[in-house]
Amino acid sequence: MLKPLGDRIVLKAQEEEQTVGGIVLASNAKNKPTTGVVVAVGQGRTLDNGQVVAVAVKEGDKVLFDKYAGNEVEYDGETYLVVHEKDLVAVVD
């Protein structure tokens, strides 16, 4: 499994299949997904004094993230998104 370093977070992005009106979009018309599920988290950000600040999300959290955040990574036949904690916008209940 992927183990992110520092304040990085591994997400499994969730694609939206339909518009609010129920119209299915062509694959080239879709925007990059902005919601995902946290798969793994790093230990946190290290401050200048050496103190580690833990990441605010945990595995299994559903999150919103910036539209162009992170890097796509393929691992074991799956596509994941690796983002920094600062790229997360909110946790969805």
Swiss-Prot record:
A single GO molecular function term of this UniProt record: protein-folding chaperone binding
Keyword set, alphabetical order: Chaperone, Cytoplasm
The keyword Protein biosynthesis is annotated on this UniProt entry: no
GO biological process: chaperone cofactor-dependent protein refolding
Chief subcellular location: cytoplasm
UniProt family annotation: Belongs to the GroES chaperonin family.
Name used for this protein in its record: Co-chaperonin GroES
Species in which this protein is naturally found: Limosilactobacillus fermentum (strain NBRC 3956 / LMG 18251) (Lactobacillus fermentum)
